[in-house]
Amino acid sequence: MQQNGDSLYARYCRMGRRFEISGGLTLAAAIAGHVTTGGNGLLSVLMVVGFVLFIFGAMNMKPSNMIRAFATQLSATNDPDFAKGLIDAMEKNGVTALSKASLSSLNLAINTYAASEGADEEIVTRLCDAYKKHVRKTMF
């Protein structure tokens, strides 16, 4: 699944940044065109597209969303690459507060991977340690 030795976490972060940058550039170009030409419908559509791309990128870079995305993929596939990506997402973002739904998704992913055939014990231990050190429940 991995290419060029990149971790899935690094690829996920790069993709989020690409969305932010392309959205920001599209939005800036559409605003500049709107200001210089006095506006038109196509430029308004481009502004919306740029804004949406920027928001998607920003939301993907939010630590709680990263953890939930990797947890969802891990529980669906039981792939050790997604387990390593989940570990990276928890460790590289410091202490992350998760909602009840995200916590249950994360617990499901860890338990499903730990119970699967051929689960690497070292990865399971690292998942549990990262969970204990870097995840806490939100206040509400």
Q: PLM features: residue spans?
A:
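Charged, low-complexity cytosol-facing tails and large interhelical loops of integral membrane proteins
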Residues: 74-140
